[in-house]
Amino acid sequence: PAWAQDAALELAQARQAVDKATQADADQYAPDLIGLARQGLEQAQRAAGDRRERKNAPAMALRAAADADLARVRSEEATVTAQLQLRRNEVNQLQRQLSTGEDRR
């Protein structure tokens, strides 16, 4: 049936989204969201194997993928914000060195 193909596709996409979020350090920067995504993926996988719940599996997998995508984006945002702060600190340090005459020859 078509819903079985949908479930397989949605489950694969959800697994991929969870993997991408994990690679983006979501466990560190968005632990609640990645946990929710993993839990949702497990529920979708169980539903896919249960005759009575099988039709719900695609929607459950979509939700898990959305949670994983959000976890990945939040993690990437935290990483970029940290890098930006590091660069600002470097600029401030260089400005202080220039204004105090350090490193002049």
Give the residues covered by each predicted segment.
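Long, charged/polar, soluble alpha-helical segments
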Residues: 2-105
